[in-house]
Amino acid sequence: MATKLIVGLGNPGPKYLWTRHNAGFMVLDRLAHAIGASVTRKSFSGVFGEGAWHGERLLLLKPQTYMNLSGRSVAEALRFHKLPLCDTIVIHDDLDIPFGRVKVKEGGGHGGHNGLRSLVQELGGAGFVRVRVGIGRPVHGDVVNYVLTNFSQDEMADLAHLLDGTLDLLESLLTAGLPKTMSLYNNKDLLAP
């Protein structure tokens, strides 16, 4: 059974629970629930759990270091489990993708995302798979404030569809591979009827 480390990026604590920056945590929680795993064990400067899905052993990690230091947590987990970077899937929010869409890719720059910046720095490279959950850009105002505010009421009404669609993407990634998943999901509106 192959092993994958799946990381959801976010900020710890109830204050950040429903913020846009916590989209990675939300998807990871949805995945854990779907596979009957519990992500509660304190380990690797985060909370950790394990489960299996489609013949893969999944190590689930939510760094508790705050976004800007997420790389430390992920590096600890990879070292302990002796996993290569290519067996890591990182789920994070993305300002450059509209709400309701997700994209998946391997490698690339951090695009100004401090969590990704920390990962690339601590891991010594960017050769991990990224599941980019669209949160859109603010019409007015500061990006930092925007990512740390809760989803709007309209977005909250559609959030379950976005999370379920992202879970479908993860399932495709594990069963069909990256190229097929990219072609299926990278331009798909998950909120379309």
Curated annotation (Swiss-Prot):
Enzyme kind, highest EC tier: hydrolase
Places the protein is found: Cytoplasm
Annotated keywords: Cytoplasm, Hydrolase, RNA-binding, tRNA-binding
Gene3D superfamilies: Peptidyl-tRNA hydrolase
InterPro entries according to UniProt: Pept_tRNA_hydro, Pept_tRNA_hydro_CS, Pept_tRNA_hydro_sf
Superkingdom as given in the UniProt entry: Bacteria
Record site: Discriminates between blocked and unblocked aminoacyl-tRNA: N11
Feature type site, description Stabilizes the basic form of H active site to accept a proton: D93
The UniProt record lists the keyword Ubl conjugation: no
Biological processes per GO annotation: protein quality control for misfolded or incompletely synthesized proteins; rescue of stalled ribosome
SUPFAM superfamilies per UniProt: Peptidyl-tRNA hydrolase-like
Active site feature: H21
GO MF annotation terms: peptidyl-tRNA hydrolase activity; tRNA binding
EC number: 3.1.1.29
Subunit composition and interactions: Monomer.
Protein's recorded name: Peptidyl-tRNA hydrolase
Organism: Geobacter sulfurreducens (strain ATCC 51573 / DSM 12127 / PCA)
Lineage start: Bacteria, Pseudomonadati, Thermodesulfobacteriota, Desulfuromonadia, Geobacterales
